[in-house]
Amino acid sequence: MCMTDVVIAWVDGDDPAHKRKKAQYLTGKNETKFDDVAGAMRYRSTGEIYYCVASVLRYAPWAREIYIVTDSQDPHVDEFVAHNFPDNTIPIELVDHKVLFRGYEQYLPTFNSLAISTMLWRIPGISDSFLYFND
């Protein structure tokens, strides 16, 4: 039996709540200075989460579990999977940043994928080896 999980970091940058949260931390900052690292293009959601999940389900049926790491958001992949992969047996679980950063809440919110990546090992029940995708 395969013991490899899949982790997908995902954010819906078009979500009004996410935009407000991010703006709260950029207010008063030089916007052009942050365009490269915090510009809207870096957070735009174009449905890539569905392509990623579909690719895993189709080409990695040996995966044990899929974890979608997000900041209080839900990509609603369950409906997509039920419709397109009715025989799917791979569990899909949402993992909030608060779970990853438990004990380090002072560093939240974070909009830095590198900071998030360093905490993936803290996903409860994650396998020793996992594939990491970042939208």
Q: What feature does the model see in each segment?
A:
Residues M1-M3, A63, S127-D128:
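A general structural motif
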Residues M1-Y43, G47:
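N-proximal low-complexity "stem/linker" segments adjacent to membrane-targeting elements
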Residues V6-I8, I68, Y132:
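Structural beta-sheet core signal
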Residues L26-R44, D74-S127:
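Active-site-proximal specificity loops/subdomain of glycosyltransferases
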Residues S55-A63:
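Short, acidic, metal-binding catalytic loop of nucleotide-sugar glycosyltransferases
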Residues R64-Q73:
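Short beta-strand/loop segment that forms part of the nucleotide-sugar
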Residues S127-D135:
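Short beta-strand-to-loop acidic/aromatic patch adjacent to the donor-nucleotide binding site
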